[in-house]
Amino acid sequence: MIYKSLLLLLLPRVLFAQTPWVDSTLDALSLEQQIGQLFMLAAYSNDDAREDALEETIRKYHAGGLIFFQGTPEKQALLTNRYQRAARVPLMIGMDAEGGVGWRLSGCIEYPANALLGAIREDGLVYRVGKSIGRHCRLLGIHVNFAPVADVNVNPLNPVIGIRSFGEEIDNVSRKAVAYADGLASRGVMAVAKHFPGHGDTDADSHLVLPRVNHPASRIDSIELYPFKHLFATGMPGVLVAHLDIPAYDPSRVPASLSPRIVTRLLRETLHFDGLCFTDAMNMKGVTRGRKKGEADLLALLAGNDVILFPEDVAASVREIKEALAKGLISEALIRERCRRILVAKEKYVLPYSTPIDTTRLRQRLNAPEEIALKQKIYEKAITLVKNDRFLLPLARLDTLRVASLNFGDRPAKTFEQALERYAPCAHFSLSREATAADVNRRVEQLAPYNCIILYNSAARNSAASQFGYSDRLPALVQKLRGKRVILCHPAAPHALQPYALLPLDAILLGYSHDPIAQDYLAQAIFGGIRVEGQLPASIGPAFPAGFGLTTSKTRLGYHQPELSGLNSVALQRIDSVCRVAIRRKAAPGCQVMVARNGFVVYNKAFGFHTYEKKRPNAPTDIYDVASLTKIMATLPAIMMLHDRRQIALDSTLACYLPDLRTTDKAPITIRELLLHMSGLKPAIAFFQHAVDPASLIGRLLSTRRTPANTRELRAGLYINPSFRYRDSTFSFKEQEHYRLVSPGFYIHERYADSIPILLRHSELSGHKRYAYSDIGFVFLQQAIEAITAQPLNAWVQRQLFHPLGADDTDFLPLQTLDLQRVVPASDDQVFRESLLHGHVHDPTAALLGGVSGNAGLFSTAEDLAKIMTLYLNHGTYGGQRYIDSATIALFTRAQLPPGQNRRGLGFDKPETRPGKPSPAGPSAPAASYGHGGFTGVFAWNDPDNQLTYIFLSNRTYPDEFNDKLNKENIRSQIQEIIYSALLPRLDEKTTSTTSPDDYRLSIIHCPLSQSLAYQ
């Protein structure tokens, strides 16, 4: 009677609340059924042989719940529905999903280890992780997640906690654990803090033996218990008690999970925890060793636990409990009290979600784009910089660097290497951790030509048992690289870095993981694609304490999921359909689309093939003839840079820079007029037609209808006379003296080539200064640039712009400097040149001027073009270097005249703002936007209002330029409109760092899960 009175005093108030379902259900259960409710059995969705036996066990022993382990989401959902049908009282379904359901189930999102979350300064992101995991649990009918891990990782040799902990700082661990738990709670999922009273400072694995925490109670109270006390203060609904020997609390060597002093006295009475108390898995050797089957489960119940998790033998456990009841060692009142506590939890966490799991598109719903983006964000924000001598990172002045990477270890780092190549040319080497001294010396010799070495330590491991992957070959290598700039990238736990921390390294970055996403962000961090702001979750010796982390600025383009830049990736997928339809309709053999927003590339895909013969698929790294994009990618930046240097003035005349024009009608034309296409110059000179021998023709060269002479159809409404021949001393189809190569099998006589500048100089003017697009004007601008700089245009922009930017796949004359395999053929000109134009410029003027011209001739990739367009969006800076003054960018990119006169900026095209008039951009492009198109089917456009860059590349001129389906069907504008339709609503709240465990609720990423329509 005294025992029962004490028991009633200890029962939390929640057990006496009026809960009709709990009371009626409890009254309807027999004692045996109440005992069954105390057990959560192990379940697997990858073991068909166990399914029937488990269902029979549920029926026979009236199990209260299941904890699922490995398998697939679809099978687990089906099994959950099946097992729930077999249960009289709804089962409480649990999972050990610290990193999400993907921790256990294939094909689902697995979030990074808690150590990465501990490296993040923004607690709000941890809340969102918990919320996302909670959503996944709900989709799978999971009611309980055995997380967060509240252990403080103060022992580097801990074999079981390690990176599962948020770190070694008690405040950081507490805040992160509370944020994670509240995220779960926001989705109605029970969080269970573990491993009480703290598993962080152990050197043994409780799966195998009983670890000891050999500290005084005062130390445990101030370190190990600190996060748990914070969690309990927030109303933590569940706790998991570990199998630990803690002499300070119970000198009898009884595991904490079996100790009344720890479970009842410490947890319930001292810390006032009134939630559900779970044991750690009861099949672990740390608790079962030396005890007969079922004995430990009985002791756990007597200690004060509510739920026996993963019993070794449920039949033996039930038998032990019944025998204890018969002997009076345990009372029916205790069983009823524990059962009632479980039913109270079920009423809150199970009953509201008791409908069968919907398996429709389950895997798709478990992988929402917003959550894939959140996973990326975690890896990005965790990147930690602990050393940065002379502010080496982010790397600047790429034109001064010769970069090489070396993968130390035997795990491939392909993603890391490819990500480096987005920013600069990079040679790649590797060295095994088992390398000999001779191997090290050989690699050092191979690295001699390079002055910047990026080491990626793929040998690093998270386990103390493997000595964290240490090898003395890495220090030996670093010592031999003295005199070079050496950056170490560490993809593992901080503890693994300690032996290398004091080496002569210029910079040290931690990515904490070898995951491809982490590899990508490490590379981005090196070059300034992301801002680095992570903190150490655990110390690396005294030099680098927990919480330490340097910061860097974002200086270059980064790469991430569209949702992180406020774009809907599902909506952007419509671009794929438009491109495939365009290719199917033969608007072009292939194409590429790139979209960047807020300084991040969010979409970059290639479609189709280089040619209709389909021999080489298009790739995102392909190089295109960008035609008139040359104007804004080479000529225009040169003009702006010279304008900033006061070497060219907009209202100065051509004659100021080109004395040969002083006696011509071109002398008074100003630079401004050329940039506005208001100089009176003709659009172009038809040099091929100009060279046709009239004597070779019967009738006209071209006709709008078929005639006896004009028999070859070029396109609808255009026919050519195929019998034409070129005049002597103009062009030849065979190599001979005094002829220069134009394209394969096509040559120009040197006299005719020399006459082209003269023809341009004396070309006819229109007599008015109205807008009329002219290529000739940009040829004159090229000549002015070359006169001022005393260098060819291609050499000057390469040295002043492309190479410093890291745009090393951009150049004129690609056969001399670029990889021909990646160059997309522009045309198979069988009309005038009878040549395949593969690495030879398509534009006739540029071709006849030797391949370098101010109007065309440039070859480039989407990524390189994006770098230049981003320079414009950044008001003239890129990579931490200023190229053009911000005022100059503002001047050149704004409309110069009223819309009725000229919509253009200086060199840039602008949207047409007059209703009903054709526009180069889609109707959603704002007036502030600008860009340019190109004849080969290319387009580049910036929208500063929305911080958008859109690039479209194609070779629509293959096999010939007379295919205008791309323009007629408005393919480029269609895609641009899709981009605008994908813009997500602007949010007032932004992700911010937090110092209070309550502040994280204000934290948000660009696309909150609550706004997802397709995946709720």
Language-model-derived ranges and their functions:
Residues 1-20, 998, 1002-1016:
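Bacterial Sec-dependent N-terminal signal peptides
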Residues 18-109, 450:
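N-terminal hydrophobic targeting/anchoring segments and the immediately downstream early-domain regions
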Residues 64, 237, 342, 583-617, ...:
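A short, well-structured edge-of-sheet supersecondary motif
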Residues 30, 66, 74-91, 101-103, ...:
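Second-shell residues forming the walls of enzyme active-site clefts
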Residues 18-57, 269, 291-564, 568:
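Preference for extracellular/luminal or secreted protein segments
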Residues 574, 581-592, 614-677, 764-777, ...:
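Short active-site loop at a secondary-structure junction
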Residues 559-597, 601-603, 769, 786-791, ...:
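Catalytic loop of the DD-peptidase/beta-lactamase superfamily, centered on the K-T-G motif
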Residues 666-927:
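Short, surface-exposed loop or secondary-structure junction motifs
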